[in-house]
């Protein structure tokens, strides 16, 4: 089975009494005879542990993403002096490093500083998005993540990058999630 979007892939960690819907879906697929599952940029590839005796492959669409970016954005220049790849949080850092290495440009990241003295809607609220990386002033930046839920963090990150005088700013979830 080729699944461009892995069903319930954000449901990869168990909190309280939640089910592991992604793991259950993979197990159900193998129960009906599926031996091989291919997906694109799984949110957490460790979900393959739910089906240890079956084939599970997560394909990184990095080349296709960079090719589409260069084809559709004529003003972009993938040179270290002109561009950076930015991770919006710690969870996307591996993906950003991979993209940065493939594109041959620097990488930066944000971390979410949280107030651990409060809980709002079941989470500790984010106080600020702190940037770690080289100066983005005058550079085109691509903020890359695998999924966007509400978009609130992405807006905060984009706002901070513009405050730091980044030029052209592109935000994108993985190509399989961009709709």
Which residues make up each language-model segment?
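Generic enzyme active-site microenvironment
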Residues: 2, 39, 87, 143-144
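Single conserved hydrophobic/aromatic residue that forms the stacking wall/gate
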Residues: 170-173, 177-179
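Basic, amphipathic juxtamembrane/active-site segments
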Residues: 155-165
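RNA-binding accessory domains that recognize and position tRNA/RNA substrates
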Residues: 2-54
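Short, glycine/charge-rich flexible loops or terminal/linker lids adjacent to PRPP-binding catalytic cores
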Residues: 9-18, 53, 57-70, 74-81, ...
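Short active-site oxyanion
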Residues: 34-36, 82-85, 169
């Amino acid at each position: 089975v080729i699944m461009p979007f892995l069903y319930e892939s954000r449901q990869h960690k168990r909190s309280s009494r939640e089910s592991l819907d992604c793991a259950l879906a993979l197990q159900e697929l193998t129960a009906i005879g599926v031996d091989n599952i291919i997906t694109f940029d799984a949110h957490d590839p460790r979900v393959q542990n739910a089906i240890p005796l079956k084939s599970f492959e997560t394909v990184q669409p990095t080349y296709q993403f960079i090719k589409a970016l260069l084809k559709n954005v004529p003003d972009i220049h993938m040179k270290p002096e002109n561009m950076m790849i930015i991770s919006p949080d710690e969870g996307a850092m591996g993906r950003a490093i991979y993209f940065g290495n493939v594109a041959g440009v620097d990488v930066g990241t944000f971390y979410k500083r949280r107030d651990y003295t409060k809980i709002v809607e079941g989470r500790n609220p984010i106080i600020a998005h702190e940037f770690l990386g080289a100066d983005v002033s005058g550079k085109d930046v691509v903020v890359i993540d695998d999924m966007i839920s509400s978009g609130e963090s992405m807006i905060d990150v984009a706002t901070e990058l513009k405050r730091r005088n980044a030029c052209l700013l592109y935000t994108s979830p993985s190509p399989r999630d961009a709709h």
